Amino acid sequence: MKITTSRIETESIGDKGIFETLFREYLSGFSVELDPSVIAQLFALPYFHGFISFVDNKPAGFAVCFESFSTYRAQRVMNIHDFMVSDSFRGKGVGKALLNGIEQYCRDNDYLKITLEVSNDNVAAKNLYSSLDYEDYRVVLKGQQHWQKYLN
């Protein structure tokens, strides 16, 4: 079994089709319909970075990432916003390979860090992230909280 990870080429019709198929599978877990314009809008964002993992050349998972910037450290930051491994490929190392591929891209391009969000009840994901040395912000930045305000 060979696992590979590649960065999505936003101009590639093939990558767009593969991503759309995986993204529909991802959204089905949330009972959400895919707005037909989402992928085009996503691929048009200059700060979008997408990654796809393959097992023996079959699409197996994806990550939607967004680039931001640390004003404190004057370096780019990569945020993993959506992360999914297809049901049929879970438990086979795809998630680890996908995260390692993102990390390698970030190291090669001088990013400061990688951030992500995970639900408290997603034990499998938290175990994966911990195994690769990700840690809760509160461990690193005691006394800080992340807040949000939905606008619609």
Regions found by a protein language model. Give the residues of each.
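C-terminal "cap" of GNAT-fold acetyltransferases
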Residues: 2-3, 11, 112-152
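Conserved GNAT acetyl-CoA-binding A-motif
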Residues: 99, 106-117
